């Protein structure tokens, strides 16, 4: 049985994987310390199961609520289902990068990491709906070190 599996395993390793890329523009909500709008975009590339993306997101500050503005610039790795299941491709992600937090005259720029997951739902052709949840851990001296974010966005696969 093992001898029969060896040629099949070698054949699978030698078959070239198709690369794909995608772009997402998103709108969502950050819940820390109060609900506020977050906007952003990401561009990524991937093979069958492993992918990578760069993402930028922005949340405006809300002075009356003492909620800081936050900009994140993150590079993330993704593990995803190799094929869509019922038109949905699930993924988990983690990564790191730089953040900039501001509230009035106070500002903090430092390193942050994030972990999360989501799903890309096929709509028509290369157009998909992307739903994503992330938890950030911000180093340094931010006002809120564990902000959370939920978003939905239009994703174009190319």
Regions found by a protein language model. Give the residues of each.
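Bacterial N-terminal signal peptides that target proteins for export
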Residues: 1-7
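Extracytoplasmic loops and strand-loop junctions of Gram-negative outer membrane beta-barrel proteins
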Residues: 24-26, 99-101, 137
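Short strand-turn segments of transmembrane beta-barrel domains in outer membranes
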Residues: 27-30, 74
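Solvent-exposed loop/turn segments connecting transmembrane beta-strands
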Residues: 29-39, 62-69, 103-108, 139-147
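Gram-negative (and chloroplast) outer-membrane scaffold detector with strong preference
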Residues: 44-113, 121-125, 129, 150-158
